């Protein structure tokens, strides 16, 4: 039991050390006292936006909007065309399958139904 307890503590210490190392490599130490547990609500949203620059809207997004809309329309047309082709192909296959089954008769030895 003592060996299990010792290995558990060593594993926990190693895990915390690695977590602290990764956080400090990213520029924010994990165990520092600079972070508040419950930050003020008016500052929380701004901090989240500054931490995640991918959430901020780029300035050049409006210039490509008409071309993106046209591309979206073309993709929708292509999707509809593919779905229509699949549906017609499937219905043709089902028609061929059902027509071939009506011509065949179920036979067992010399008795056919």
Curated annotation (Swiss-Prot):
Highest classification ranks of the organism: Eukaryota, Metazoa, Chordata, Craniata, Vertebrata
Disulfide cross-links: 107-112
Organism, as annotated: Mus musculus (Mouse)
Subcellular location: Secreted
Protein name, as recorded: Urotensin-2B
Membrane among keywords: no
Family per similarity comment: Belongs to the urotensin-2 family.
Keyword ATP-binding: no
Signal sequence interval, chain numbering: 1-27
GO cellular component entries: extracellular region
Propeptide residue span(s): 28-103
GO function term, MF aspect, one: hormone activity
InterPro entries: U-IIB, Urotensin_II
GO BP terms: blood vessel diameter maintenance; regulation of blood pressure
PANTHER family given in the database record: UROTENSIN-2B
Main location: secreted
């Amino acid at each position: 039991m003592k060996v299990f307890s010792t290995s558990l503590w060593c594993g926990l210490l190693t895990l915390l050390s690695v977590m602290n190392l990764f956080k400090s490599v990213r520029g924010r130490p994990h165990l520092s006292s600079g972070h508040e547990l419950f930050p003020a609500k008016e500052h929380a949203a701004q901090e989240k936006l500054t931490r995640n620059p991918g959430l901020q809207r780029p300035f050049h997004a409006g210039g490509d909007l008409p071309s993106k809309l046209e591309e979206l329309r073309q993709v929708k047309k292509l999707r509809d065309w593919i779905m229509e082709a699949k549906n017609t192909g499937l219905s043709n296959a089902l028609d061929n399958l059902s027509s071939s089954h009506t011509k065949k008769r179920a036979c067992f030895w010399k008795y056919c139904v």
